[in-house]
Amino acid sequence: MKKTKGSIMLLFAAFFWGTTFVAQTTASDQIGTFTFNGSRSIVGAAFLALLILARTGMKKQKAKVSGEPVEKESIKRTVIGGILCGCVLFFATNLQQSGIAAYPEGVASSGRSGFLTATYVVMVAIVSGLLGKKLHKIVYVAVFVCLGGMYMLCMSGGIDNLYFGDLLGLLCAVCFTGHILTVDHFNDCDSVKISCIQFITNGVLSLICMAIFEQPAWSDLAAAWFPILYAGIFSSGIAYTLQIAGQKYADPA
């Protein structure tokens, strides 16, 4: 039952991530990579902070009515986990957005980037196997299917059909593999809090890079308000939190 619950959470997370690729592609034509990821991360962190405040208020009210004390939790491990997850996510999301922006006009950047990013599913299974975890036979089939799909997507037209964005997409998948495994290591922490902290970390790092490399005009940010808001709330705020919560019940591989 718990595994089914985790799978449903991860399914909804995948849905929100998939729909966000369109927003990411739109934003790549309007603002820089670090600007977009910094902005969406801050929006996501703010959304989750409000959720944490609301949930804390409800817990206190419930404790007041029942007369039971509010359960205290150690925040140290959650903060450490959130910062580590945020650092890995910084590389993953910015490589992903850079890859989308790197594709030439006319190339289906959303589809290519989405598929290449999703190869982290196979990478996680492979890494888990290397770490001594017994893998189901279907994983080996998935590896060959994935490799075949990558060839058809990137190499069916020869070397000329291979783009720099494809390489960035694969590097992004490697980073997302690291993120999945890091989340799994801290799966005993509060899902919403660790997600909020990871996006504060990702947001701060991305905004520092934005100030150094991009320095966008306010008009550019205003033009990209919808992709930023959509990605910030639905992808960063909701989907990644569902991922962290779902991994408590489902095997990362």
What residue spans do the PLM features occupy?
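Cytoplasmic-side transmembrane-helix entry/capping segments in multi-pass membrane proteins
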Residues: 10, 77-84, 135-147, 165-169, ...
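Helix-helix packing/entry segments at the starts of transmembrane helices
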Residues: 14, 39, 113-119, 182-203, ...
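Membrane-interface helix termini and inter-helical loops of multi-pass transporters
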Residues: 22-33, 98-106, 151-164, 210-228
